[in-house]
């Protein structure tokens, strides 16, 4: 009986230690990102992802950091490297967590980064994919504020490109803000971004 108890204590302690390492590592990576050190943050998220191969969350953040910091990048080589890494870790996350609307939104953001860099080259092939991704994500998670916001912002961008009125999509941005107020998930470090962006986009609706 004593041996069983000792084994149980060791197992529980090992799990707790691993969880502490994960939590501390993720917090440090977010700190680096907040300090405008995206490369260092990405590298740390990547090391955590390699240690947490059954957890899609750190893989998500490797992809997210590299995607966000690709917008506005003019150097094609740097952009390609970042977005290829983003896609690599997105695919790993999708293998762990298939049919995940958060990952669908992220995939659409990766596509949008390519389109923003060169719409003439990438717009025709990736715009249709984004439409499908957002429709699929919305069907699966209509109460997810990032899904609602990202779909609305994509449609607003498309409307602006073709010289159409963006007003019909402003109500969806407003809806996303309502959803942000109530949305929660118990998974540690689950994506929570978007509210500030929704407020910016909604203000633009009034201009």
Please give the residue ranges for each predicted region.
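N-terminal targeting signals for Sec/Tat export/insertion, comprising classic cleavable signal peptides
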Residues: 27-56
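Canonical positions in the second alpha-helix
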Residues: 48, 93, 136-137, 176
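Amphipathic alpha-helical repeat scaffolds of TPR domains
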Residues: 20-28, 51-73, 99-118, 144-159, ...
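Short coil/turn connectors between adjacent alpha-helices in alpha-solenoid helical repeat scaffolds
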Residues: 29-33, 70-82, 114-126, 158-168
